[in-house]
Amino acid sequence: MKHAKKTRAPWILLACLAAIALCIVAAVTLLQPNANPKNIEIPGTRGNIPATIQLPAKSARGEELPLVVLCHGFTGNRQGDGHFAPLAEDLAANGIATVRLDFAGCGDSTEPYANYTLANMAADVDSVIGYIQATYGTGKTALVGHSMGGRLASLYPQLGQYPVTALALWSPANGTGLQGLEFLSIDNFAAVEEMAARADAEGSVAAWGVELSAAYIDGMRDSDPNATLQESGLPVLLTYSGNERILSDTTQTETKAAVESLPDGQVVLDPFVNGDHNYTSEDPATNTQLDADLRQVTVDFLTSHLQ
């Protein structure tokens, strides 16, 4: 019996060491900052929506995973001028899931640009939120929107199907009605009005190398994103750069006033005085700093309201 105990002891020790090693591996895995981004297609109301999801490597037990939807701007794509992927990494490291999508006619979307309307964009956001909730059990949801994506995010509490907890707006094109299209001809608004009239008469109008539908023009004309922000009462982060150029001072002033009137409205301008509308710069060091600052203020805001 004594001899048998001696022969089993090394095996017991080895088994214990193996168990400890597995625990260490599991712990290291859980401490990884995030999971890899995954490109998928999400079923939508008009066909599949090209999207990229990124999930945290772990989430707190018993708690729903927060979700952020990243909305790109006019003629943009789900890269968000290079800001969305690193932002998704940062949010994943903070326990927040993200989904970024290509709207109709943009990026990998196979739809014609004529389907790019505010109503269709809101429907696409509905589809991706519903899909991510059903698939991953996400809970609190926020939107980040740049430029026209910021206008959409501002309007989503009115147009969308799902409740949202907070909004982060990067240089939103929030001019009232057709003023939201001022970027098409910032120095001559009469030209914008002429484009709108042509779309009304002919069903569409060409601008910036794409075809704008009468439905898109109508949606812009009938919307007032700053009024919607004030009605929603949601926490809102607003940023503008120092060199917007394609957005008027009037639009910026009115949008700042709308956000500042909110109980949890936050306007951040100083870090971006040397950036353009896309938060970029020709100077590499400035460009890097702009991206870092944009992500930092956004992550700080979102984590404070989603966790």
List where the protein language model places each region.
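N-terminal cap/lid segment of alpha/beta-hydrolase-fold proteins
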Residues: 28-61
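Catalytic nucleophile-loop/oxyanion-hole region of alpha/beta-hydrolase
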Residues: 42, 78-80, 106-138, 288-289
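Active-site glycine-rich loops that stabilize anionic/oxyanionic intermediates
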Residues: 65, 72-77
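Conserved alpha/beta-hydrolase
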Residues: 88-110
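Alpha/beta-hydrolase fold nucleophile elbow
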Residues: 136-147
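Glycine-rich nucleophile elbow surrounding the catalytic serine of serine-hydrolase chemistry
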Residues: 145-155
